[in-house]
Amino acid sequence: MKKTTKPPTGGYGGSGSHELYQRVKKKAGTIKASSRRWLERHLNDPYVHQSKVDGYRSRAAYKLIEINERYKFLKKGQKVIDLGAAPGGWCQVAERIVGSSNEKPSVVGIDYLHVDPLPRVAMLEMDFLHADAPQKLIETLGTKPDVVLSDMAAPTTGHRQTDHLRTIYLCEVAADFALSVLKPGGHFLAKAFQGGAENTLLAILKQHFKKVYHVKPPASRSESVELYLLALEFKGKTKIQE
């Protein structure tokens, strides 16, 4: 796959984006200052521009690309499950790397939000926290995964510690799923928010994987508290787990 982790340093290009920017400026008095700042940052984000060029559905695709370029845990022929997949950027990246087909998809995503169909990717529209979700994922994939990805994050409240705890909970649920379904030697990548509560999860991951890392890829905004937990080379189920 073409290297795309160093997008142009300029703002979002094209006449369409310029027109949108002008509309944003004209309506500046009718929207909150925080919303206006977000729109202006979004329009000038080089990753947003590059995602249009490369055909990815979100700038988040580059977070996965950058992490994988460094640690090379996604490889051709693997089976992948993506939790919290909307709008589909991570599934696109995974499919392009591991290879897949419409008849027998190697990448399965799940989200309670609707995701428009993606070529060679199976998508389940359901809440991962539903009791039936884990079984549905394995049935759809047809085998145990080599990689479990999770970009799940709880809706933010504006209270940093609350947001941290809610997202860490989702990370813990994703990790529990990964520990129960991964093939030996498999890998797990999940979003977390910095705040301290991730230390317990890190300790658990270190028991079950040979290598565990904190990762903050360049595509993750510097002011964001998000980071990613990457656990490599699953040791396999212990007798207690079994």
Swiss-Prot record:
It holds the Pfam family FtsJ. Its main location: cytoplasm. The active site is at residue 191. It is an enzyme of class 2 (transferase). It catalyses: uridine(2552) in 23S rRNA + S-adenosyl-L-methionine = 2'-O-methyluridine(2552) in 23S rRNA + S-adenosyl-L-homocysteine + H(+). Its EC number is 2.1.1.166. It is found in: Cytoplasm. The keyword rRNA processing applies. One of its GO terms (cellular component) is cytoplasm. This is Ribosomal RNA large subunit methyltransferase E. It comes from Bartonella tribocorum (strain CIP 105476 / IBS 506). The gene is rlmE.
